[in-house]
């Protein structure tokens, strides 16, 4: 295997501007979400993250990572296919 010299990375003005715009966008989204949480907090839903219910915690994690579990079928025909005996 050939070893090569490290590649030099240069920070350009365009990169800095892009970073700043993305950071500002994320900050505005965070503020909007906090505002919604404060308004929704009067209903008592603001403490969902502090809930000790394992189902809601699992559901929050699944929502965060984008996992949507599919229910498993319980009948035998779905386990073994449609075999005729």
Swiss-Prot record:
Paired cysteines (S-S): none
Known pathway: Protein modification; protein ubiquitination
Subcellular location: Nucleus
Cellular component GO terms held in the UniProt record: anaphase-promoting complex
One of the GO biological process terms: protein K48-linked ubiquitination
Keywords, comma-separated and alphabetical: Cell cycle, Cell division, Coiled coil, Mitosis, Nucleus, Phosphoprotein, Ubl conjugation pathway
This protein's name: Anaphase-promoting complex subunit CDC26
Organism of provenance: Bos taurus
